[in-house]
Amino acid sequence: MLNYTGLENKNVLVVGLAKSGYEAAKLLSKLGANVTVNDGKDLSQDAHAKDLESMGISVVSGSHPLTLLDNNPIIVKNPGIPYTVSIIDEAVKRGLKILTEVELSYLISEAPIIAVTGTNGKTTVTSLIGDMFKKSRLTGRLSGNIGYVASKVAQEVKPTDYLVTELSSFQLLGIEKYKPHIAIITNIYSAHLDYHENLENYQNAKKQIYKNQTEEDYLICNYHQRQVIESEELKAKTLYFSTQQEVDGIYIKDGFIVYKGVRIINTEDLVLPGEHNLENILAAVLACILAGVPIKAIIDSLTTFSGIEHRLQYVGTNRTNKYYNDSKATNTLATQFALNSFNQPIIWLCGGLDRGNEFDELIPYMENVRAMVVFGQTKAKFAKLGNSQGKSVIEANNVEDAVDKVQDIIEPNDVVLLSPACASWDQYSTFEERGEKFIERFRAHLPSY
């Protein structure tokens, strides 16, 4: 809906280029705004900056001159830029309007929105909703924090489509009129306190997701965190999910996902592993039911969706052994979730960059670990950990070598789990590269027929 006129002839300052700033600047120019882009980095050789300049958009880089505020612009801020940055801090003092580009996506599109936020699980929930839409004849376009710039996708959707948008707390701080038809808060734990300063500020940022909702909209949230999530501002119809008890919404009972007393699917038929993922699944299923996605499409998705790449991703089965790639587990909390996701014996591949951490906090989660294959800078620490718990420990040179060594010790029905609990930078440039090496090596060991 590029006939939106609310920004025509307005001065707008886009602070922070990156993908979202680039797309926001182009959109604002189409909407008739007088656009300036500012970035603290030198953009003199940046291709996107040159592209914007060719459109007549001013680009000021290398610093944040406060004179850019003299024409009282509306600020469109990159969500990763904290409010303590000089130009943003000064804009706040002057009372200037500060938005993020997801607000633009709402202003220009008539498509209903499913918005997903939370400390953990939001990417999985967003992706699963997208997969359920894909299995149906309906269209749900992914956008936001999941990697697709919301204001760009919003220009491409029809009013009959859904925008399925993942939102971080940073993005939610910059909304004014943004109103999802269906909002999901997966959970709220302590996080990003370096940005928000305290837990209360972080919680309030998450609650922004429902501040503009009305009685015709829906909020989906964790029943067991309802006191943290709900507030007097909440006007939407609230529905809950729970893996522990019957609730007004969706829940697990007798091993089935149940909605309004109707069994949808046996949890044993789900491909995505882990108790934490059960909550993610419940939230996604409920959102899709409310959006009109057929139950058959939902079931088709649940029996095939194996997760996000590198996040407890089901890679495949070799004979009776399932392999899981959790390379994104770069800290002990993520690995705790992974180890807690299986009842079968686990061969655990772990190790990586040594940041001076000890790993004793993983001991309570090692009950099902039968053997460990350790690698990287921390392999001695993990070997010590495994030996202290009476586990079989094998040392490997890297992830590829670890998968090779697994073949010597694997037994029927073992789960092979790469969950390093460490960053990858001692041996790999990214956790994605580490995960890809794991997958490649798994495939190399598949029997050829």
UniProtKB/Swiss-Prot annotation:
Subcellular location: Cytoplasm
InterPro entries attached to this UniProt entry: Mur-like_cat_sf, Mur_ligase_C, Mur_ligase_C_dom_sf, Mur_ligase_cen, MurD
pH-activity note: Optimum pH is 8.4-9.6.
Catalytic activity: UDP-N-acetyl-alpha-D-muramoyl-L-alanine + D-glutamate + ATP = UDP-N-acetyl-alpha-D-muramoyl-L-alanyl-D-glutamate + ADP + phosphate + H(+)
Biological process per Gene Ontology, one example term: cell division
Enzyme class, broadest EC rank: ligase
Ranges that cross the membrane: none
Family classification: Belongs to the MurCDEF family.
Family matches, as HAMAP family: MurD
Name used for this protein in its record: UDP-N-acetylmuramoylalanine--D-glutamate ligase
Organism of origin: Staphylococcus aureus (strain NCTC 8325 / PS 47)
Gene that this polypeptide is encoded by: murD
